[in-house]
């Protein structure tokens, strides 16, 4: 009966959002597993359970899709306080911890390695990664530092310095294929980086000494407990 006919209207905003996430999740997984060169748009469409036409309606080519994957991954990046932080060091410490935890996820690590290995053949990947870093890391930190009292004409350079400090240990381990830092190591490095940036080397050194003192005290307590059990 005509009165019972169900019409298919345009997909809702929520439907579109879910489908987009489905496409980008599938694409990130495929790029991470197989590399940029090997993945085809048809494979992504099949993996995401959408038509090739739907995929091409959203992304003109594979590079556009890869670029969208980078932005999609960056949506998990932490945010800094909107207003001027009362404690700049604490805000930057928390941000440093959160950003490294995101970058240390399996998919982020594999995408980073993909860019490193395939950028010689596809230099556009490197440019896309740099643009993504500027948009989702450098620009937000720059804006935060300006609100925290840094001069407008130098805030971006200071933002880059802070990020270099905060990400240095993660970058070193990635470069030399070493185990990624543990949660405790991430927290310690983030605290030292923020202290160095805000207060200089003396503050960072004091934090390092405090960490070492804590390790020694923990070791002494462990030995005392072990002896007591004998």
Briefly describe each language-model feature range.
Residues 6-11:
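Arg/Lys-rich, glycine/proline-spaced intrinsically disordered segments
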Residues 25, 89-105, 109, 113-117, ...:
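Amphipathic alpha-helical segments that line or abut small-molecule/effector binding pockets
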Residues 90, 110, 123-149, 156, ...:
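Amphipathic alpha-helical packing segments from all-alpha helical-bundle domains
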Residues 131, 146-195, 204-222, 230:
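Hydrophobic/aromatic-rich alpha-helical bundle segments in the mid-to-C-terminal region
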């Amino acid at each position: 009966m005509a009165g019972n006919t169900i019409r298919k209207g345009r997909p809702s905003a929520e439907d579109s959002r879910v489908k987009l996430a489905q496409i980008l999740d599938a694409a990130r997984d495929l790029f991470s597993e197989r590399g940029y060169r090997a993945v085809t748009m048809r494979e992504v469409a099949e993996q995401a359970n959408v038509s090739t036409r739907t995929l091409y309606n959203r992304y003109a080519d594979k590079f556009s899709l890869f670029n969208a994957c980078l932005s999609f991954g960056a949506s998990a990046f932490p945010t800094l306080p909107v207003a001027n932080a009362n404690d700049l060091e604490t805000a930057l410490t928390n941000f440093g911890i959160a950003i490294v935890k995101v970058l240390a996820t399996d998919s982020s690590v594999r995408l980073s390695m993909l860019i490193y290995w395939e950028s010689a053949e596809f230099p556009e990947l490197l440019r896309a990664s740099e643009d993504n870093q500027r948009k989702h890391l450098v620009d937000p930190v720059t804006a935060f530092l300006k609100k925290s009292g840094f001069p407008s004409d130098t805030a971006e350079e200071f933002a880059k310095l802070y990020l270099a400090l905060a990400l240095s240990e993660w970058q070193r381990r990635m470069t030399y294929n070493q185990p990624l830092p543990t949660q405790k190591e991430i927290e310690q490095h983030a605290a030292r980086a923020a202290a160095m940036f805000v207060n200089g080397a003396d503050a960072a050194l004091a934090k390092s000494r405090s960490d070492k003192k804590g390790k020694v005290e923990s070791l002494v307590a462990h030995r005392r407990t072990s002896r007591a059990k004998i």
